[in-house]
Amino acid sequence: MALDITFPDGNVKQFPDGTTVKAITEGISNSLAKKAVAGKLDGDLIAYDEPIAHSGQLQIMTKDDAEGLTVLRQTAAFVLAAALKDLYPDIHFGQGQATEDGFYYDTDRADGQVSVDDLPTVQKKMEAIIKENAALEPVVLSRAEAFQAFKNDPFKKQLVEAAGDPIKGYKLGDFVDFEEKVLLPSLKDLKHLKLLSVAGAYWQGKSSNPMLQRIYGTAYWSEKGLEDDAKRRQEAAEHDHRVIGRDLDLFFVDPKVGAGLPYWMPNGATIRRVIERYIIDKEIADGYEHVYTPVLANLDLYKTSGHWDHYREDMFPPMDMGDGEMLELRPMNCPSHIQIYNHHIRSYRELPLRIAELGMMHRYEKSGALSGLQRVREMTLNDGHTFVALDQVQEEFKKILRLIMDVYEDFNITDYSFRLSYRDPKNTEKYFDDDEMWTRSQSMLKGAMDDLKLDYYEAEGEAAFYGPKLDIQTKTALGNDETMSTIQLDFMLPERFNLTYVGKDGEEHRPVMIHRGIVGTMERFIAYLTEIYKGAFPTWLAPTQAVLIPVNNDLHLDYVNRIKKQMLVAGLRVKVDDRNEKMGYKIREAQTKKIPYTVVVGDKELNDAAVSVRRYGDEHTEEEAGNMFIDALVAEVKNYSRDGKTKPGEATKVLGD
């Protein structure tokens, strides 16, 4: 039976049954064959030298394609397992995967785990296996054969139970692994790899399952790829908010309490408090009414909103109160804000009605997905909802967008882009059923962007079921795109909760609900800022804005304490380092803690009513009059936060008085 193969250019050719991707590639050109590593048939990766199963659309995957790198790393994970089995015959295996930047394999040993010190030995064994260049043989096992092959491995047996029949695998010498992924046709190209680290991971990501040991590595087609990867990892480590958070004592996670439940230390709590006060003041000034709503709610609320039907896997189990009442930790704040809207009869004169809250939420995140402050189980969202008439959408959208960009400016966030998401015009039946509302609202959002003369990407088919949206994507410290802010129109929740307002005509009308997040959750935003600033927070955000160091406590401490008092009165965050340590040590420690200003006071400064100031990152110090330094610092803080409450010169008295 012939195979009808359609190529990316639309050409269709027939090939005999049993033809491989390799045979087709070699028939196209030798240069392509040298780079090819796999195929993609109707969107699914297929092995390079196995018979093509059926007719379809075929793409040749090469070393230049992302899929090619995935195949390389899947092969590296397989060889890692083979090396581990050779070194530790008693080892059990979970699953191995290629990742965005490498690969891993989950393992378990009864007789002691593999440590990071063992990785050079394991890598040497991998390199020896690769050097032998033994054939990677595809194998097909019946379920019974697979059970026999993995009879001593409890985790592989679970995978076999969940798999179909027959089961695909690969054989390398005496080593056989249950492997439905595509591997390289041979090991000759697997030359540039490195094992990186060891960490714990629950089996299948469930905390109720055994903790396995995850061995991480990476692989590239060239040595340069490995070198560039090492540089990126070093840079990532220097920006990693988890490392910086530990070094600057911002937050910690206690396993006795639970993963994904961070404790905010005084330094981190100060940063968070400054941001929270800032954002609340910004929103109130922009017409929002700030509220507090319960973190618990009756489960029926989330059934009405649809969260229980569509997001149940992300919600914690309900709490049965024993009297028929079921309470739920809220996964989102919008149903609570709807209750506030619905608490009164609303008039068109009240619209737009803007409600905002720093609302605590809970998400049922698997332990394997948790990461520092970026992925947590308890979070506080800078959340807001506006209720508008349909003809107010465009102006309100612009108002929200201006607020977002104003906040970005204060935090010096300059690298961002806009993505406007519409419904799919060819598949409208999967969206909320109101063509006129969709047409008008999408036109309004586009009109608002054009009015503000902003560049944006239009993404058809990416809108939510219930309305179009705008995502604002910022660049992380490592140059990756991350959605920071969202403006989302919602036609569905007003219907579900029967929201109305009385119009000019005296009749009831349905409002449009606009969800908007300015900076997302406090946890994720502070993680982002920590990495962007590399821990060197701008003065207005820094937990300690200045440290004062007397040269001699007996002679200079009284003067230093007077300076401290004036700075505290001015609303600044300042500490005195009067420990019995060497001056150089104190200054170095202040720099290590990334405190914006280190202020030293000795005889000259005392006599001149002055201070010697060293800015973080500078090598030199400058002498300034004490009053002028404090005024300049107050002005700097005011400039970052635009709070306007203290004018330079108002906060200080003559320090020599």
UniProtKB/Swiss-Prot annotation:
Q: How is the cofactor bound?
A: Binds 1 zinc ion per subunit.
Q: Which cofactor does it need?
A: Zn(2+)
Occurrences of domain TGS (ranges): 1-62
Nucleotide-binding as a keyword of this entry, yes or no, is: yes
Q: Where is this region: Catalytic?
A: 240-538
Molecular function per GO = ATP binding; catalytic activity, acting on a protein; metal ion binding; threonine-tRNA ligase activity; transferase activity; tRNA binding
Any Pfam family from its record, for instance, is: TGS
Sequence positions that bind Zn(2+): C334, H385, H515
- Tell where it localizes: Cytoplasm
Kindly give the InterPro entries that the UniProt entry links to this protein: aa-tRNA-synt_IIb, aa-tRNA-synth_II, aa-tRNA-synth_II/BPL/LPL, Anticodon-bd, Anticodon-bd_dom_sf, Beta-grasp_dom_sf, TGS, TGS-like
Q: Which reaction does it catalyse?
A: tRNA(Thr) + L-threonine + ATP = L-threonyl-tRNA(Thr) + AMP + diphosphate + H(+)
Q: EC number(s) per UniProt?
A: 6.1.1.3
Q: Ligase as a keyword?
A: yes
Family designation:
Belongs to the class-II aminoacyl-tRNA synthetase family.
Cross-referenced HAMAP family, in alphabetical order? Thr_tRNA_synth
Query: What's this protein's function?
Result: Catalyzes the attachment of threonine to tRNA(Thr) in a two-step reaction: L-threonine is first activated by ATP to form Thr-AMP and then transferred to the acceptor end of tRNA(Thr). Also edits incorrectly charged L-seryl-tRNA(Thr).
Name used for this protein in its record: Threonine--tRNA ligase
